[in-house]
């Protein structure tokens, strides 16, 4: 979704936050496309699991693990993904399924395989969190723009914005 004046920014999946602020609240409510904040059904759960996964990645990086530890981390990784999926809408579940590959069940994963899998999951979660922050910011900007528009339309004739001279008014002035 590139425009001629897009400054080489491409928005992948979702609404461009630069245009979100110019849309009215009614228009965004009528949209068939759910917002990113609606796609995370249990945000607290997703945040807790994301924090845990990030900490596990730090542990995997810090020291070499024996076979039993690697097997346990493989199970934790699979359980974490299942738990994450419970907190996500179907669209995000499908995306997560496409991006995560299961470990080989017959052998313990190597330290490198664990690091890659954990880093991939942490990166996906951080992207999700940044997307949510962007969506919330865009919603705030849209609400602010709508409030300013309401304030401006509520001013009596002849009154301008604060700091501006009054416009063309009706009636006589003393």
Curated annotation (Swiss-Prot):
Q: Could you tell me the keywords of this UniProt record?
A: Proteasome
Which Pfam families does UniProt cross-reference here? BPA (PF10759)
Provide the Gene Ontology terms for cellular component: proteasome complex
Keyword Nucleotide-binding appears in the UniProt entry: no
Q: How does it assemble?
A: Forms a homooligomeric, either hexameric or heptameric, ring-like structure which stacks co-axially with the proteasomal alpha-rings.
The family line of this record is: Belongs to the Bpa family.
- The protein depicted here goes by the name Bacterial proteasome activator
């Amino acid at each position: 979704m590139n425009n001629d004046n897009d400054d080489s920014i491409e928005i992948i999946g979702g609404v461009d936050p630069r245009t979100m602020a110019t849309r009215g609240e009614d228009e965004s409510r009528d949209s068939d496309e759910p917002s990113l904040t609606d796609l995370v059904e249990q945000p607290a759960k997703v945040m807790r699991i994301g924090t845990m996964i990030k900490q596990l990645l730090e542990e995997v990086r810090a020291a070499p693990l024996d076979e039993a530890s690697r097997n346990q981390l493989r199970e934790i990784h699979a359980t974490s993904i299942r738990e994450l999926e419970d907190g996500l809408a179907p669209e995000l579940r499908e995306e997560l399924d496409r991006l995560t590959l299961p470990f080989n069940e017959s052998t313990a994963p190597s330290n490198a395989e664990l690091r890659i899998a954990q880093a991939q999951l942490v990166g996906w979660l951080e992207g999700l969190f940044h997307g949510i922050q962007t969506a919330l910011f865009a919603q705030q900007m849209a609400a602010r723009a709508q409030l300013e528009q309401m304030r401006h339309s509520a001013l009596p004739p002849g009154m301008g914005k604060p700091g501006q001279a009054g416009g063309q008014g009706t009636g006589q002035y003393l």
